[in-house]
């Protein structure tokens, strides 16, 4: 299968393609920011508000009726001066003091498998639109949730940080891929494109949220899943 990374995207985008990019970006940006504010109030802020979901890659498949693929990244940081920020800083100071007393690599490894307060300082979201997305879930050592079928929320819980994948649209079976990181796994989700649908249409969305368990759960609880699903073409 031809993948986004195999394509030469050097040619300029057409007006229609730019319009699709802008429209899709705004819809996703508004939905995610609304969920973040509803879950955390003013505790988190955009790390780079000028970018507002600027695409990392805008790839045009050169195959007839194939879709326009977009990859976006959105990063929030914990706002200094908030109660949540001060709490994390206090916990981080305690964590670092404890780390300084460790006497062996084994002790350090065991401590690294606990919650590190520094994980709360950032909330990262990767967004894949119409993309043959290859997602590596590292820290997949304990209690991995079995991934069965696309179309729902899948949670991969490591020690401390959760990678949560939200799939919307038309996907084929998830497949496990080789991963060189000891104790970890990698999965990929391949969209199933409908040739009867307009090339410039959202046929699949995959969100990958990386943050501590409780942060991911709070954000997910406020996500307008119906609005995300409504972006998908029939």
Report residues per predicted region.
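Short, surface-exposed charged micro-motifs
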Residues: 197
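Surface-exposed amphipathic alpha-helical segments
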Residues: 205-234
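Boundary of Sec targeting at the N-terminus
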Residues: 4-5
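Short, solvent-exposed recognition patches
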Residues: 12-193
């Amino acid at each position: 299968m031809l993948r986004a990374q195999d394509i030469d995207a050097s040619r300029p985008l057409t007006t229609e393609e730019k319009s699709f990019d802008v429209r899709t970006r705004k819809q996703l940006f508004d939905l995610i920011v609304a969920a973040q504010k509803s879950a955390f109030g003013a505790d988190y802020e955009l790390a780079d508000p000028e970018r507002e979901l600027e695409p990392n890659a805008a790839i045009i498949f050169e195959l007839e009726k194939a879709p326009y693929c977009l990859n976006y990244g959105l990063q929030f940081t914990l706002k200094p001066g908030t109660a949540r920020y001060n709490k994390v800083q206090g916990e981080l100071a305690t964590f670092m003091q404890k780390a300084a007393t460790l006497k062996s690599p084994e002790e350090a490894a065991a401590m690294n498998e606990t919650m590190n307060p520094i994980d709360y300082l950032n909330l990262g979201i990767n967004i894949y639109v119409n993309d043959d997305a290859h997602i590596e879930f590292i820290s997949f050592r304990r209690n991995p949730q079995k991934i069965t079928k696309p179309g729902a929320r899948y949670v991969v819980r490591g020690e401390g940080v959760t990678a949560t994948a939200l799939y919307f649209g038309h996907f084929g079976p998830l497949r496990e891929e080789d991963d060189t990181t000891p104790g970890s796994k990698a999965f990929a989700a391949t969209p199933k494109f409908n040739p009867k649908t307009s090339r410039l249409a959202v046929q699949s969305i995959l969100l990958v949220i990386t943050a501590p368990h409780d942060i991911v759960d709070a954000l997910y609880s406020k996500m307008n899943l119906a609005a995300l699903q409504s972006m998908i073409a029939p």
